[in-house]
């Protein structure tokens, strides 16, 4: 299992647009083969800070996800909504 944690800081005036795009991305991604969990989360201390926490069966599932129509269409739209560069980290479960 591979976990992806992708953190974004959204421009204050773009939060609503971001959340609309995220809704579609999450709904479609959850239906993909190899997707174990896919959530979008918002910080309790700063409404502009969001993160995806994604659990995938393996790298092949991630590669397939990254090639989907919805990923290819939605992800580029995020770039104009961010206040800062997205931070993405991959994890493996140890316990």
Name each model feature, range by range.
Residues 10-12:
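Beta-strand elements of well-folded, non-transmembrane domains
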Residues 14-37, 73, 78:
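Short amphipathic alpha-helical segments
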Residues 1-2, 95:
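Absolute protein N-terminus
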Residues 66-72:
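Long, charge-enriched, surface-exposed interaction segments in small proteins/subunits
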């Amino acid at each position: 299992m591979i976990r992806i944690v992708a953190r974004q800081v959204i421009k204050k005036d773009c939060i609503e647009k971001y959340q609309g795009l995220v809704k579609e991305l999450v709904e479609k991604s959850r239906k993909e083969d190899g997707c174990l969990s896919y959530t979008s989360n918002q910080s309790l201390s700063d409404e502009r800070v969001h993160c995806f926490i994604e659990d995938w069966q393996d790298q092949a599932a991630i590669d397939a996800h990254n090639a989907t129509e919805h990923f290819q269409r939605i992800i580029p739209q995020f770039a104009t909504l961010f206040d800062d560069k997205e931070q993405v980290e991959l994890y493996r479960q140890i316990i």
